[in-house]
């Protein structure tokens, strides 16, 4: 009977460790981001601002929301470029209510984009009618 209990305990321990390992692999890195006109390239003088959290999983999944104020945003994206440079959009954000912009369900980065994230070379950009290239921006710094 002792052997049976030990075997059950060993099996339960292995199962728990396996679940823990899977959850670590899928865990996300939460990055707080603040968006301002000063971060734009070139800089924009604006009272608009934004803040939020973007989570990037080790499986390259992307989730999160940024909340903006003082801006009537017409589009928002996560772009690929280092601070001080402009780059192409890689994830289009979905406009919600009250100035909220969220990642679409199932959003994922490519391997190249994930490496760029780890190097600090992704940013969130909110565009307005007055500033089509972007009015506020915030670099994602892991």
Positions of predicted regions on the chain:
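Metal-centered catalytic cores of metalloenzymes
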Residues: 2-4, 18, 23-76, 80-142
